[in-house]
Amino acid sequence: MAPGPSNWLRFFWTTSSWALRTACAVHVIKADIYDCNETRGESMLTTLQAYGDYVHELKKYKLGRGVEMGDLVVMSKPTDPDSRVCKRITGMPGDMILVDPSSSSELTYSPRDRETNEGFNRFVEVPKGHVWVTGDNLCLSMDSRSFQAVPMGLIKGKIVAANSPMKGFFNEDEKFSFLNFKWLENNFTDDS
């Protein structure tokens, strides 16, 4: 005997209900708990590959809650809010920051720039509620040197791990590593 219309209707509603619940759960997890995204760009070399690494991001650090100097964060790009970027926090509120350490010599400044930038070094204080972020690969990074201090409200999460599935099952030391998974720890040391 063929199922009646009420059985098909019940099946449709049950399936739709579970699909909607699953979609809501996935949305909540990605928005508020955890997300995983592929890297694109060379600004974080050598910590992360330009392409093919997947970063694991904890959302409990959203809006800058609990972030520290040296943490890797995912944030909305200040010049394009629809884009996400990965950067390292190199200055916290109240810190005095050398804007561009890579250009702190007389070889990189023209005579006119030397006059307007107080010699070779230009320092700024990170305002309250902001952080200073830079890429690990300074020569290929668009970061706070370009768009100044970033509001903590743009921070979407903290990167805690990465993996490189394209590299196979062994890391650089020829040791087994599931999809080249690695924890990314904060390696900042305070020299003061």
Residue map of PLM features:
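Soluble extracytoplasmic domains of inner/organellar membrane proteins
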Residues: 119-165
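Residue-level recognition of short, solvent-exposed, well-ordered loop/turn junctions
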Residues: 48-51, 68-69, 92, 126-127, ...
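A generic structural signal for residues embedded in beta-strands
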Residues: 56-57, 75, 99, 133, ...
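Acidic, glycine-rich loop-and-strand cores that form catalytic or ligand-binding grooves
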Residues: 90-107
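Protein maturation boundaries and topogenic segments
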Residues: 1-86, 104-105, 148-192
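Solvent-exposed loop/turn segments at secondary-structure junctions
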Residues: 62, 80, 97, 139-140
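Short, surface-exposed loop/helix-turn segments at secondary-structure junctions
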Residues: 109-118
